[in-house]
Amino acid sequence: MEEIQRYLQPDRSQQHNFLYPLIFQEYIYALAHDHGLNRNRSILLENPGYNNKFSFLIVKRLITRMYQQNHFLIFTNDSNKNSFLGCNKSLYSQMISEGFAFIVEIPFSLRLISSLSSFEGKKVFKSHNLRSIHSTFPFLEDNFSHLNYVLDILIPYPVHLEILVQTLRYWVKDASSLHLLRFFLHEYWNLNSLITSKKPGYSFSKKNQRFFFFLYNSYVYECESTFVFLRNQSSHLRSTSFGALLERIYFYGKIERLVEVFAKDFQVTLWLFKDPFMHYVRYQGKSILASKGTFLLMNKWKFYLVNFWQCHFSLCFHTGRIHINQLSNHSRNFMGYLSSVRLNPSMVRSQMLENSFLINNAIKKFDTLVPIIPLIGSLAKANFCTVLGHPISKPVWSDLSDSDIIDRFGRICRNLFHYYSGSSKKKTLYRIKYILRLSCARTLARKHKSTVRTFLKRSGSELLEEFLTSEEQVLSLTFPRASSSLWGVYRSRIWYLDIFCINDLANYQ
């Protein structure tokens, strides 16, 4: 990366942005495949690898072939094997696409590193560990007391391939690199398989994943930039101050000041308080836009976005892909949670001189609940219980050792508690723990050809409690002097940044 930074110094990159010559450098492919000195992952996607087929000999042959006049003959040849190179052409195309994806990421990486270094005092932040899922945590923890409606948006697809090239022109000003990108899109890959998924989330083939995700993230960035533009255009009423004073429980006061606003050639005096105009979050192929506006205003936003995307991306985007829902009476499945907004009532007694009176306040709070029915369905599909939630034994694990059986059940339980640690109500998880605990006991009893009660009396109940309560043990070690408030800490919502790494139940056989 240091050699790349020397090649793309700020003054040179601003004047030329010549990225095309880098595709003929061997170290680019070493960095792209994590076989060089730099073992860092891409900021956009973790490198999937090439099944140990990468070697510098293949890279040298590839670069030699590209220097020839008809070096792209390996792509246009109908046969799977190239007679001149004697190697699978898909491997060469995959190597070139991975190297090209790494090259076009360089301007983004350098710009991100420079911005983060200036912001954090020359301390580079490891942003390759962050995903779009992490932006949902502050969204779910934000204050929704002033929001009324929400737009559930499915990101538009498909997009014309030339639009992708035009989008990258604002970032990569090297014409040769753009021509090479256009060649990749139109000559090698199927034109209808890039971003044409009929599901809310997008999935790509294992080959060329890095390149596909780079194009998709660039496209999503272009879509999301429209929200910034629309927000700036709609915020023509300037506001200067806002204050939240916590006097008692759920008591909030707003400081309002006189603001002078110039609009349509005449001066208007308005009383305003500054409040967030919209809340936006995206995860996979869905995005949510929450606002404090009325239904009529949200409907205007809906048609504005539809018309804007149709004109900007030259695609047919139906209004049915954007749904307007009221926060107070609508629940949605989001990130595996059943999310809804509920009113949290609070009663405060106030006394003035000899008279006392009660004040009833209702605060909007965003709830993230555990979907118990889908979870039981997943456990039933994996043969841990019946469809009604009655625990059963898992015969396919009876041949394993006792420690392996306990470890598998414990890992599933810990993963579920770890993922749903951000739930507002964790009582549902204890029903899942009961199912897994009893299923584990029945599996062990089946293995030893005894009943559950006999097995527990012989081995002791501590054997199951030891691996199923690791979450409480971690909290007790973290807060050793606060055992009395341990239950309150455990009930609070905790968001872990590594929840995207947790495997699904389908991965356990």
Swiss-Prot record:
Its main location: plastid. Coiled coil: none annotated. One of its GO terms (biological process) is tRNA processing. One of its GO terms (cellular component) is chloroplast. Keywords: Chloroplast, mRNA processing, Plastid, RNA-binding, tRNA processing. One of its GO terms (molecular function) is RNA binding. InterPro entries: Domain_X (IPR024937), Maturase_MatK (IPR002866), Maturase_MatK_N (IPR024942). It is found in: Plastid, Chloroplast. It holds the Pfam family Intron_maturas2. Belongs to the intron maturase 2 family. MatK subfamily. Usually encoded in the trnK tRNA gene intron. Probably assists in splicing its own and other chloroplast group II introns. HAMAP family: MatK. PANTHER family: MATURASE K. This is Maturase K. It comes from Nicotiana debneyi (Debney's tobacco).
